[in-house]
Amino acid sequence: MPSHRSLAGCAPVRCGLGLFFLAVSATGTLSGQCPDGTPPPCAAAPRVLASAHIPDANSVAVLPFENTRRDTAYDYLSDGLASSIATSLAQVPRLAVRSPSFVRRVSQSAVQDEAALGRRLDVRYIVEGEFQRGGDRVRVAVRLVALPSGTERWGDAYVRPSADLLGVQEDIAREVATRIAGALLPPETRALAARPTHDPAAYDLVLRGNFYLAQRSPAAVRRAIDEYDAAARLDSAYVDPLARVAYADGLIVFYGWDFGLPADSVLARGVAAVDRALRLDSASSDAWMARGLLLTRREPRSYQGVIPALTRAVALDPRNTEAWHQLGTTLQYLGKSAASDSALRRAVALEPDRFITLSNLATSAEMDGRFAEARYWNDSALAVNPTFVSALGARVRLAIARHDTATARAATAALDRDRPATEVPIAMAALAAYDAWRGDTASARARAERAVQVFGDATHVLWLGAPTAMALASAGELDRAMDLLERLQPHGIDMHLFLRLPAFDPLRTNPRFVRLFAETSPPAEPQ
């Protein structure tokens, strides 16, 4: 029987229930294409990109830099250089800079032609380049390409000491901004010249940490924390490593990963780091975002302070896609669907292929009974990641809701295959619901038993325990479903969202369920 660690040691990109609070890096097989060949959101879904085919004149995407030495020890610089240059360019309000994570995913797709890449990214310019690092020297070659013509507007190569990587990025960002927007205004020049740290070694450690954090696995997050801690020791005034350690600690508690510390100790460490970051720089959007995440774990019954923190994060940086996603999902958990949809759509406008956000929009619509809209958002999520177990499960539920046997059967066929342990409860919940709908109680019970066997006693992993209870409820095992729900922890706002799902309708009038539903209800106006 799997232990707590085996269930909680998953890569979140594979284990979602479509109700994730957190966004994840998009690894795995991504198609990024709707059934009609267009990029997501799929055409039938409510559109959020009014200018999808008319890119802003000053729109630009920075592609990951190619490591020409093929030395994997420096792979972290591929995304690190691109993200840092994009972050600098975003300080120029006249530029429309695409999200680095969106650009990374699109650049990894099958699109090769520059013009097609520009259409997918919805930009007029791309920045592309390569680097070689060896010893104490680094060579960076870069060019700015205008689209759709493919004309090179500017190019250069820099050979500098490795310790001057920040200077190289500053020079590139300044040249790109000037070539696109024209002469820079004094505030723009100052913004581009601002450096997060003056310690090159600390900066390098943060880039390494970012590389590991994006992988979203327990081992990689542990490595990221080590890199960030080392950076903070080198430069005690450096805000970025503190904010990211705090965010990483939030991930650890959310996913129930075993790092050898009680959850309360991990939270205390994260809160201390983010408080220190905000004392150094109260205008750090990432620090406010990390604070919001930590408070959902520290205050699971009230979410006290979460909405103000996340609202502050998006106000400070309206291009912070992750903060918009977190704000929208928090509002979803609080039952504020209109405000939630608005924030989630802002995230999708910034990153159209963000399948976790697309899935959350589908969940919101499903809970409100807007099944046609839920279907479109869910199809958009599957267009990006056809193997996403949560969206496949949602496709089954939505097909059942509209009595579409053919679609439900096809979706169950995609679910009913060998899966990692961390996907089994989610898949079994959908399969048990389908079997019960068809009247095959024996098969539904077998699915539920499979979910129970895999889940074991990991009662702190709510996002896998709740689907296990769903499977039991669908199979008619109502007392066992209630027993499991009462054992799951914490009894807070996160649990309440699961309890709102139609899968628990067989328990809706059960006195124990009624008490649990009331106990986990969010406050009317969280502070």
Each predicted region: which residue ranges?
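TPR/TPR-like alpha-solenoid helical repeat scaffolds
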Residues: A246-A248, V396-I400, A427-A429, A433, ...
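C-terminal non-catalytic interaction modules
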Residues: D483-Q527
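N-terminal secretory signal peptides that target proteins for export/translocation
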Residues: M1-P12
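Sterile Alpha Motif
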Residues: V461-Q489
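Solenoid-like repeat scaffolds
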Residues: A349, S380-N385, A414-T422, R450-T459, ...
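Bacterial N-terminal signal peptides
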Residues: R14-T29
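Acidic, proline/glycine-rich low-complexity intrinsically disordered segments
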Residues: G32-L398, D404-P420, S443, P502
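Alpha-helical adaptor scaffolds
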Residues: A290-R297, E322, T329-Q332, T363, ...
